Each structure stands twice: as C-alpha cells, then as structure tokens.
Amino acid sequence: MAIFDTDIFIWIQRGNSKAARLIENTAERYLSIQTFMELLQGAASKDQHKYTKSFIKDFNFIVLPLTENIGHRALIYVEEYSLSHGIRAGDAIIAATAVENNLPLSTSNKKHFKAVRDLNLKVFKP
C-alpha cells in the first residue's frame, strides 16, 4: 500500500522497469488529486490524457481528493518549509495527502519531502 509521487509515473513513461515493478508489486495504489492533475498537465496531447486516465483506471489507483484537512496541513507545510527547504505547493499537497491518509509516499525526489517529519517516505532509486 502506498501513495505515489508524480515522478514515479514519469519514470514509467520513460520505460524504467523498476518503477513499473514497483507499481505492479504494490497491492493498494493511491495517488493525490495533485499528482493526477500534474500528470494531465504534463501531457502533450489528448492521446496522452487518455493513456494517463487508462493507466490510472487499469491499475486500480484510488485518487484521493483534496479535503479541508489536507489543504490545512499543506498550508502549514508551505509556511514551515518553503523558505528553509524550498517545498512547493504541489509537493506540500502530495505530502499532506499521504500524511492525512496514513500512507507511505513513494518518490525518487527525497529532497522535495525530507523536511516533512511526519511523512513516511519510501525512496525509490531508479
């Protein structure tokens, strides 16, 4: 069981078999609505939109919505860590989604999240 950061999907799109196995070997798969939006925003065509949506559906990802609690926690993370560690709003939302849902976050971007002490970080090494 894990929530996946956007970078894991990017590794898969680049053909990284370790990232693909990570997804395949995780029984319960989650992603933040923020990650879903980032994936769609990064698409270069409607076909890539379709592919992304199909991938999410075919692998039974549960897309976790932005709730009031997640928004509040993300705001705290931005206030606490944006100046000292450079955390950006999108990463704060993803981290807050993981913490609020008591899920480990799988990412290869350790530096984006290392400041968030209450986050269970699972670092992926491509």
What residue ranges belong to the model's regions?
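Generic structural signal for small/hydrophobic residues in well-ordered secondary structure
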Residues: 5-6, 39, 74, 98, ...
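Short loop->beta-strand "edge-of-pocket" segments that line small-molecule binding or catalytic clefts
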Residues: 2, 28-30, 59-63, 104
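Active-site neighborhoods of divalent-metal-dependent phosphate/nucleic-acid chemistry enzymes
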Residues: 62-108
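Alpha-helix capping/helix-boundary segments
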Residues: 8, 35, 70, 93-94, ...
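Acidic, PIN/NYN-like endoribonuclease modules and their adjacent C-terminal/linker elements
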Residues: 1, 95, 101-126
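Histidine- and aromatic-rich ligand-binding microenvironments
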Residues: 4-7, 32, 86-88, 109-110, ...
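Short, well-structured N-terminal submotif of metal-dependent ribonuclease cores
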Residues: 1-31, 41-54
